[in-house]
Amino acid sequence: MAIINMSDLDLQGKRVLIREDLNVPVSNGVVTSDARLRASLPTIELALAKGAAVMVMSHLGRPTEGEYNPEYSMQPVVDYLAKALSCPVSLATDYLDGVDVAVGEVVVFENVRFNVGEGKNNEELSQKMAALCDVYVMDAFGTAHRAQASTHGVGMFAPIACAGPLLAQELDALGKALDNPARPMVAIVGGSKVSTKLTVLESLSGIVDQLVVGGGIANTFIAAAGYNVGKSLYEADLIDEAKRLVANAKSRGADIPVPTDVVVAGEFSPTAAATLKSVSEVADSEMIFDIGPDSAEALAKIIESAGTIVWNGPVGVFEFDQFGEGTKRIAQAIADSKAFSIAGGGDTLAAVDKYGIADKVSYISTGGGAFLEFLEGKELPAVAMLEKRGA
């Protein structure tokens, strides 16, 4: 990919505008989870160390476009960065017609979604943003799948458009996992519905050696294998689709294994009593909430022999401990594996945190929707823009 990297540029005395993903949860004016802010710090610090005057922009939440709403202000992010960085940090609320920023300073722009035209990638807005800088840095992988003014349009008009270190790392890791994977390649795809992950399943079933399905998705494959799933969440209208995916995988020597044992309950609740059963014994009144220990061990063996692991989604309702053993065993197997592993998606990251394996996963993706679209083989608009500008 012919993408210019920020780390290769001379930024001395330059006005550098960085698009980060600083969309963090805020309660009573205080940031409650700082993972994305911590991830962005090295990029901001590198720009400062290179002698730049730094401007940072991001969205936060989903305000009505074009309307200022204090609930979605970037002020809590500014407060956080002011403590984390050893330089002056301020908030610019009215910046489209020009902003004063000196070398060694950071100015954070107010929420980009307060601007009319952000979501529709408005050309006039994009040009105004581009006029503020000498160098535009796209560093927000989490929004790379959206063609918006702050993620795409501005980069088309800025004097120079480049990728920040965080985005570059993300693309390298995903490329390593998907473009030239060490074999065997194993993908674990969980989640509640086949329909929301159908394109991912299609794409991965064509490249992996083993495609492990979990959660509600697995229930549809269990039903497709001819077993009763009781009152479990599954999609009857996609059973033929599941059969087709299994047949496709088998035709190229790959596999989509179905659990042999499952953990069931009569209701979905934190106090529901868990019962272990063979997959062939699920009663009409029961719901499947996890894979059983035999299935978990079989999957762990598949993971142990893998060369590349892509993990997107838990295999059970791990929020309730009695239905979390399957996901816990898979997390442990990934942690113990010597394979190159990449994990992404909100529920997956929650599982990584819960089972304390963050430092054992080769790469943790910061993007939810962007991670999925990359797995689907789709072109990400922000990446396409950077390639065009780098050519």
From Swiss-Prot:
* InterPro entries named among the record's database cross-references: Phosphoglycerate_kinase, Phosphoglycerate_kinase_CS, Phosphoglycerate_kinase_N, Phosphoglycerate_kinase_sf
Q: Name one GO molecular function term.
A: ADP binding
User: At which positions is ATP bound?
Assistant: K197, E319, G345, G346, D347, T348
Q: What pathway does this protein act in?
A: Carbohydrate degradation; glycolysis; pyruvate from D-glyceraldehyde 3-phosphate: step 2/5
Q: Which GO terms describe its cellular component?
A: cytosol
User: Which top EC class applies here?
Assistant: transferase
Q: Where's it mainly located?
A: cytoplasm
UniProt record, GO biological process: gluconeogenesis; glycolytic process
**E.C. number(s) listed in UniProt:** 2.7.2.3
**Which subcellular locations apply to this protein?**
Cytoplasm
Which residues does the annotation say bind substrate?
D21, L22, N23, R36, H59, L60, G61, R62, R113, R146
List the Gene3D superfamilies hit by this protein, alphabetically: Phosphoglycerate kinase, N-terminal domain (3.40.50.1260)
What domain of life is recorded for the organism? Answer: Bacteria
Write the record's keywords in alphabetical order, separated by commas. Answer: ATP-binding, Cytoplasm, Glycolysis, Kinase, Nucleotide-binding, Transferase
Q: Which reaction does it catalyse?
A: (2R)-3-phosphoglycerate + ATP = (2R)-3-phospho-glyceroyl phosphate + ADP
* Oligomeric and partner information: Monomer.
Q: Which HAMAP family match?
A: Phosphoglyc_kinase
Q: Write out the similarity annotation.
A: Belongs to the phosphoglycerate kinase family.
By what name is this protein known?
Phosphoglycerate kinase
Give the species: Shewanella baltica (strain OS185)
| Lineage start | Bacteria, Pseudomonadati, Pseudomonadota, Gammaproteobacteria, Alteromonadales
Q: Which gene is transcribed and translated to give this protein?
A: pgk
